[in-house]
Amino acid sequence: MSIKSEERRDFIGLSFGAVAAAGGLVGLGAMKQAWDPLPSVKAAGFTTVDLSATTAGELYQVEWRKKPIFILKKTADMKADDTIDVVVGDDRYTVCIGLCTHLGCIPSYKNNQFICACHGGIFDESGKVVFGPPPRAMDIPPFKIDGTRLVLGETGPEYEKLIANV
């Protein structure tokens, strides 16, 4: 065999390797893009609520990821609970997923209590079980406080502190 045909074989082998490597990189990029969530899905994961517009004693309900979220600005006569209250400035809030932890019914709010009509479960104004079959307090959605805004779906230090206590 001549030197020229060995050089030609080496060149063809290196060319094939380079094309295969480039194709592999393009394939990896396409796989990553396919696995990443769509921007519309990412945007749907966050809900922002302006807490400065809330009135003490009045329940506000927003939707986050197709679930009802209860936001209650506590009045001075409501029991303060440092283990579960969300504190923003001088105000205290109950922020919880508005589903009974027994079977997932949506409780109503009356006389400073959340009452589940399905099986008689009662939660206090902080979302803790007072009576009935619910096995635990109402769940707290991940949140972050940004000034007077509550950002649902994003984990902040306030949420981490509450979850450590529960």
Where are these regions (language model features)?
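Extracellular/periplasmic metallocenter environments
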Residues: 99-139
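N-terminal pre-ligand scaffold of iron-sulfur
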Residues: 13, 27-101, 105-110, 139-166
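A generic helix-loop boundary/linker signal
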Residues: 1-2, 90, 117
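Residue-level signal for the membrane-embedded core of alpha-helical transmembrane segments
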Residues: 19-26
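N-terminal secretory signal peptides and thylakoid transit peptides that target proteins
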Residues: 1-19
